[in-house]
Every structure is written in C-alpha cells, then in structure tokens.
C-alpha cells in the first residue's frame, strides 16, 4: 500500500491524477501538465515534496562526519543557514544519492535526501555516523512544499508573518532559515527562484490552501520533471546511480578535491577515474519533429573517425522551447552534432551543455 503525504486530500480536492511514485501516492498533474509547467516559468507554481526525507544531525563531531561522508566539503559552510549540494558516494565512487546539506550550528546540520533512496540513505548515514557519535533524527513530522517561479517568493511571502518576511528579505540562493513553524529555504528543482518550505504536518493543508488563494498553481510530478530537465538538473536513477561516477553525471563541480588531505568516502576511486577519464553528461537538442526519450542510443564519430555510442538518460518535449531536449551520457570526444536512433529513423541532434533554460530564458 503506497503512503500518502499530509496533502493527499488537498490534491484530490484540486482534481489531481494520483500515481504511485516510489511508494508514495503523488499528483502527476491537475488537468494540464503543460499549463502547470508554464505557470512555474511565468508566474508561480507549487509542488508537494513531502515525500522527500529531512534528516537532522546533531553532535560535536557533525562537521567532521559530513566532511568524511560527502564529496563536497561542508568546511565551506561557515554562515548559519547556508546550504550545499553534494553527492554521497560509495567506496567505488558511485552515487548513493545527491542531497542538500544545511549548516545551522557546529553541532546541528540538516540533510534533505531523495524519497526513492530513503532506506538505503538512512542505513548508510547511520552506519557511518556511529563512530562519530552523531544523533540522527528523521523529521517525519514535517511536510515540505516547493513554491517556484518568478512571482513565487512574493506570493509565498503574503502568508508569512512579519518576522518571517524580515528573515527572508534579501536571502541569497541556497540558504535556509527557521522562523516560527516554518523552515524557509531558497532552493528548488526548476531553474526558477522560489522557496522550499518545511512545516509541521498538521499545518500543511491550511498552508497549501492559503497558497492556492494567493494565486499559486498546484503542479504535479509531470511538470516537475520537464522543469528540472529544462534546467539541466539530475534525477537520481537516471543521470546517476551507484554505478555511475559523479564525473560522468555533470557533478564534477560538487567534488571538493582541496584540501588534498581530506579523506572522504569514494575519493580514492574518483582520483583514478579523474586520471583515466570517464564518460560525460551532455545536452541534446532536436528541432525536427519527434521526442527524445530515455534509453535511446546516441551515436557520433570523433575527430579521429572512430564511432562511439552513448545513451539518453532523460528526454522530453520542452514546453518552454517548443522542441525536444535530452540529457545523455556519452564517451569523450563528442562534437557539436550526433545521431539519435528513434525507431527506424536516424535523427540529427545538436550537442549542447547540459542546461537548456534558466530563469525562463533559453540557454541551449
């Protein structure tokens, strides 16, 4: 039996089509995925992300533990509320999960991890936290709503009290602050500005209804996927998993190689991969009729005349751009064009950086 978030009833009242998403009943859309997508790009939309897992870590050695656990370095986090995106790797350098870590005090950090990887993440974190004496609290008492779009912050702020409005005023991206019942973070998964707001489960439904009244459009998993793909953001299980190096998933920027004496899980394997080279993640654009889909082969000939094949990890029709886009994992040596096999047709595609839309504007 799939689990329900505290907002399940609100979704059905809003006319959602519900689907089982990694063991959670979640809204796929509320009538039109395209309308929901455009609302986020042009105005304000919101997503129930209560299926994600919030994990609080406490203890005097929490920073030391996270410097060992994560490929990115929490030593960068010196201002309370600052957040960091990182991979959590296994010993062979594969990605167990990608997550966000928030720093509050020297003995209090917070992780937000994916729902599909919840059990293995908690097991891995618990196993490695033990020698450091870390107290782990899974915050199943909290729901989370992501409010995203150019007008999202202004519309959400109409629900805040004076202290909350003051706390978020001028807050830069990748910060979070707890004021009263609300944990408000300037993070998201759409390529737009916005907030991800965690609040007690019993307050979530009222807050959702108030956002609807403030003109924020409910959005489902369908729009969430097309938005994150346009923004070039990875989805766990597609762009990366435990067999894929972050270097092959456009996550090289999340690896803190310095200082060289920091020993983090997976470092040794990553150094070998960096030396020998890995595949890489690229963007693909197809303006011809048709849609690029996951797992389609991508073929190209390198400068030496050698033929290579990669694979599409995520593909869709881009509502913002009006043509098909994809992320693909390919061998080194790809040029500016490639061929994608769609059924019995060989379709030409343009190779780009793995990002297509930022703040509503085309970049591909």
Curated annotation (Swiss-Prot):
Catalytic activity: N(6)-[(R)-S(8)-aminomethyldihydrolipoyl]-L-lysyl-[protein] + (6S)-5,6,7,8-tetrahydrofolate = N(6)-[(R)-dihydrolipoyl]-L-lysyl-[protein] + (6R)-5,10-methylene-5,6,7,8-tetrahydrofolate + NH4(+)
GO terms classed as biological process: glycine decarboxylation via glycine cleavage system
UniProt-recorded name of the protein: Aminomethyltransferase
PANTHER family membership: AMINOMETHYLTRANSFERASE, AMINOMETHYLTRANSFERASE, MITOCHONDRIAL
Quaternary data: The glycine cleavage system is composed of four proteins: P, T, L and H.
A GO cellular component annotation in the UniProt record: cytosol
Organism name: Shigella flexneri
InterPro entries cross-referenced by the UniProt entry: GCS_T (IPR006223), GCS_T_bac (IPR022903), GCST_C (IPR013977), GCV_T_N (IPR006222), GcvT/YgfZ/DmdA (IPR028896), GcvT/YgfZ_C (IPR029043), TrmE/GcvT_dom1 (IPR027266)
Keyword set includes Nucleus: no
Enzyme Commission code: 2.1.2.10
GO molecular function ontology, one term from the record: aminomethyltransferase activity
Keyword Transferase: yes
Function per UniProt: The glycine cleavage system catalyzes the degradation of glycine.
Stated family: Belongs to the GcvT family.
């Amino acid at each position: 039996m799939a689990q329900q978030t505290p907002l399940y009833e609100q979704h059905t009242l809003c006319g959602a089509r519900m689907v089982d998403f990694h063991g959670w009943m979640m809204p796929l859309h509320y009538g039109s995925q395209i309308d929901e997508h455009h609302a986020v790009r042009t105005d304000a939309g919101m997503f129930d992300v209560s299926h994600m897992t919030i994990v609080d870590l406490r203890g005097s050695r929490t920073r030391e533990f996270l410097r060992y656990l994560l490929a990115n370095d929490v030593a960068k986090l010196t201002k309370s509320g600052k957040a960091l995106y990182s991979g959590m790797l296994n010993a062979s350098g594969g990605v167990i999960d990608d997550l966000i870590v928030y720093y509050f005090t020297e003995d209090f950090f917070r992780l937000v991890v994916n729902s599909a990887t919840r059990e293995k993440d908690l097991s891995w974190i618990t196993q490695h936290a033990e020698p450091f004496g870390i107290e782990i609290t899974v915050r199943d008492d909290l729901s989370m709503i992501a409010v995203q779009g150019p007008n999202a912050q202004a519309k959400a702020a109409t629900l805040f009290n004076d202290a909350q409005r003051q706390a978020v005023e001028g807050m830069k991206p990748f910060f979070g602050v707890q004021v009263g019942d609300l944990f408000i973070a300037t993070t998201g998964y759409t390529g737009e500005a916005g907030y991800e707001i965690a609040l007690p489960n019993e307050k979530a439904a009222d807050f959702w209804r108030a956002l609807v009244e403030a003109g924020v459009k409910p959005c489902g998993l369908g729009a969430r996927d097309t938005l994150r793909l346009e923004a070039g953001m990875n989805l766990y299980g597609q762009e990366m998993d435990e067999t894929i190096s972050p270097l092959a998933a456009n996550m090289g920027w999340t690896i803190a190689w310095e200082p060289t004496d920091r020993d983090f899980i997976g470092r040794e394997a990553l150094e070998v991969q960096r030396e020998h080279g890995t595949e890489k993640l690229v963007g693909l654009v197809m303006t011809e009729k048709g849609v690029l889909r996951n797992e389609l082969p991508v073929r190209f000939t390198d400068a030496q005349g050698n033929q290579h094949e990669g694979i599409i990890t995520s593909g869709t029709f881009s509502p913002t751009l009006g043509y098909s886009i994809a992320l693909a994992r390919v061998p080194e040596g790809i040029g500016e064009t490639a061929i994608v096999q769609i059924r019995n047709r060989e379709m030409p595609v343009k190779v780009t950086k793995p990002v297509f839309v930022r703040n509503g504007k085309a970049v591909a």
